[in-house]
Amino acid sequence: MKDQVIPKATARRLPLYYRYLRMLHDTGKNKVSSTELSEAVQVDSATIRRDFSYFGELGKRGYGYDVENLMNFFAKTLNEDELTNVALIGVGNLGSALLKYKFHQSNSIRVSCAFDVNEDIVGRIVDGIPVYPMEDMMEQIRVQQIEVAILTIPARKAQEVVNKLAEAGVKGILNFTAARLVAPPEVLIQNVDLTNELQTLIYFLHHDNELIDEEE
């Protein structure tokens, strides 16, 4: 791989490419063109070629891309050969739904534990995942070597929990709360604001003719 910084927009598209390549591989297909890949993942072929160029020569002009080789390359790039243990913080409505989600699009992600304050849930096994009390969170994070946490708790409690997660050694947080959180530089936070996404979608529906496409 070339020694250079990969744009965030490119990094966000890599799982999309990988999942489609895996699907092609499962159906026995041997090669794919950038045009075919573009139509399937709805990313223009020029962007795909530019994304791939950050990783060196991945295909051959006039031939396309070898599905298995490209799939294996992105699997390694996305650390699909390493199991990442994930903790879920908050087993409310959204948290419960995420516990039921099997992360079927990746064999390398496993929610191994969950934490909550609700005494009716704590101590139970929900969809095969043990739910611990919040006071056990830091200890279990360390014992189970958790690197990533999903946050689905009330926004007012989020920063306090993030501070503890960072202290316990968590390196990445997927934040479903409305709070904008502060963490040490070595901890990455990715925000998923469902209300914001829905409001943005509604805006697009009503202002479609006014929008100008911007390339990420």
Curated annotation (Swiss-Prot):
Q: GO:BP terms for this protein? A: negative regulation of DNA-templated transcription; response to redox state
A Pfam family annotated for this chain is Put_DNA-bind_N
A GO CC term assigned to this protein in UniProt: cytoplasm
Q: DNA-binding region located at which positions?
A: 16-55
Residues in a coiled coil are none
Task: State where NAD(+) binds.
Answer: 90-95
Which keywords has UniProt assigned to this entry? Cytoplasm, DNA-binding, NAD, Repressor, Transcription, Transcription regulation
User: What protein family is recorded?
Assistant: Belongs to the transcriptional regulatory Rex family.
- Fill in the subunit field for this protein: Homodimer.
Q: Indicate what this protein is called per its UniProt record.
A: Redox-sensing transcriptional repressor Rex 1
> What organism is listed for this UniProt entry?
Enterococcus faecalis (strain ATCC 700802 / V583)
| Lineage per the UniProt record | Bacteria, Bacillati, Bacillota, Bacilli, Lactobacillales
